[in-house]
UniProtKB/Swiss-Prot annotation:
Entry's family note: Belongs to the UPF0102 family.
Residues of the signal peptide: none
GO molecular function annotations of the record: nucleic acid binding
Source organism, top-level taxon: Bacteria
Gene3D superfamilies, per database record: 3.40.1350.10
Protein name according to UniProt: UPF0102 protein Pmob_0702
Source organism of this protein record: Petrotoga mobilis (strain DSM 10674 / SJ95)
Length: 112
């Protein structure tokens, strides 16, 4: 990960910690891809994609496409399989964007 990417992710982690999320993992990788942040709140497991950068062509979050979401689901399934003691009732894929100006937009997705 590049330095800017780490800065965006650190800001996203702070955002979630300030809202009482428990960060379970960061940059969890599997052969299908990576999940930037895995967090837990109110028995919901959040698989979070962080996007950062300029808003030249709209919010950076809009760069998340269906292919990326499928990768997150595959990696999420692997994470769950390798963490059987983790207790949760639902799974949700979320996207958070951090612009170069520090603006944070959080897009909680539908629960799976």
């Amino acid at each position: 990960m590049n330095t800017k990417g780490k800065v965006y992710e650190d800001k996203a982690v702070s955002f979630f910690l300030n809202r009482d999320y428990r960060i379970i993992a960061r940059n969890f990788s599997y052969r299908h891809g990576e999940i930037d942040i895995i967090a837990l709140k109110n028995k919901i497991l959040h698989l979070i994609e962080v996007k950062g950068g300029k808003e030249t062509f709209g919010d950076p979050a809009f760069r998340v496409n269906s292919r990326k979401l499928k990768k997150i689901m595959k990696v999420g399934n692997y994470f769950i399989a390798t963490h059987p003691k983790l207790e949760f009732d639902e799974i949700q894929i979320d996207v958070i964007s951090v612009t170069n100006d520090g603006v944070i937009n959080y897009y909680p997705a539908q629960r799976l």
